[in-house]
Amino acid sequence: IFTALPNGESQIISNHLKEKNILIDLSADFRIQNKHTYKEFYKIKHRSVKNIKNSIYALPEIIKKKIKNKKIISCPGCYPTSILLPLIPLLKKRLINKKIIVDSKSGYSGAGRSIHKKYKNHNLYESMSVYGIPKHRHNSEIQQEFNKISKNILLEFTPHLTPMFRGILSTIYIEKKKNVSTKDC
């Protein structure tokens, strides 16, 4: 079963899965593995806590083998994908220090439907703007995945809306460890 529903809706569907059903979810419903963190960032109570343990944060380039053993496959968000894919290998190999600065820019389609209502009186189509500061929803998802590798990673993440419909660019500022060459990274 594939779902691309508003946050909270796939949780309801997951409560009715049959034994052989697999749910592939594009919402944030199962991205966060902690019900309290989910509520903090998404402002709604998780309605399928029992299924969190049956789900996996499925970034296939990183955890391909583990995906096949789960009933609920949660697809990462766009910003987290653009940030985690380049950083996880560097963190796993301990090539970089733990302070990471990410400056991300996205087309306005990535901010969801509500963005058009929120900015209807602004010139969304001709200017750039920061949003979701200081606590963008994807911070929780990114930090969760970092914590699986190393604790105490300091992430400074600033998302921007750009005057284009779709696309994403994340510029990531890292400091390599002293004994590491640029080629190693």
List each model region and its residues.
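N-terminal Rossmann-like NAD(P) cofactor-binding subdomain of oxidoreductases
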Residues: 1-133
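Charged docking surfaces used in two-component/phosphorelay signaling
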Residues: 110-184
